[in-house]
């Protein structure tokens, strides 16, 4: 069963403390931009997988291999474990998926959606925590707000 509002609201934790310095953010951006990009897809709600839907998502993505940025993954895991300990208390927490680096060009977007096991490697899906990190300085672009679904959406 998928939690519905308002139950799922208790599952949201937010930090305003930076995980990365501006220099570390730039290193992640540089790595993400250097990797092979693919047109981002969406789950499409079918068991056979995902597809491209330009009405839901227009962006490119790449996957940052664990071995190529171990310090980044260490910092992400530290933050994830702290959030889990402070808010959720899940057992057996570990990073199981590489970080998805998403690049939005002007006019790019990702409409309302629910995160899941985007790599499709875990059956049944085991993602317990989903994280979003803003790497770009928000004064350098318009839009891009991360919004959570509210009643009626």
List PLM regions with ranges.
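Fe(II)/2-oxoglutarate oxygenase catalytic core
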Residues: 1-153
């Amino acid at each position: 069963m998928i939690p519905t509002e308002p139950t799922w609201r208790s599952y949201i934790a937010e930090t305003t403390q930076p995980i990365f310095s501006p220099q570390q953010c730039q290193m992640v951006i540089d790595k993400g931009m250097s990797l092979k990009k693919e047109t981002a897809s969406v789950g499409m709600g079918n068991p056979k997988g995902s597809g491209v839907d330009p009405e839901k998502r227009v962006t490119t993505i790449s996957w940052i291999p664990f071995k190529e940025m171990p310090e980044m993954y260490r910092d992400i895991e530290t933050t994830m474990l702290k959030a889990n300990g402070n808010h959720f208390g899940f057992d057996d927490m570990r990073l199981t998926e590489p970080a998805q680096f998403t690049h939005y060009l002007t006019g790019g977007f990702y409409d309302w959606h629910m995160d899941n096991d985007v790599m499709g490697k875990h059956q049944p899906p085991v993602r317990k925590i989903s994280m979003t990190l803003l790497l770009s300085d928000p004064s350098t672009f318009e839009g891009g707000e991360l919004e959570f679904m509210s009643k009626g959406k």
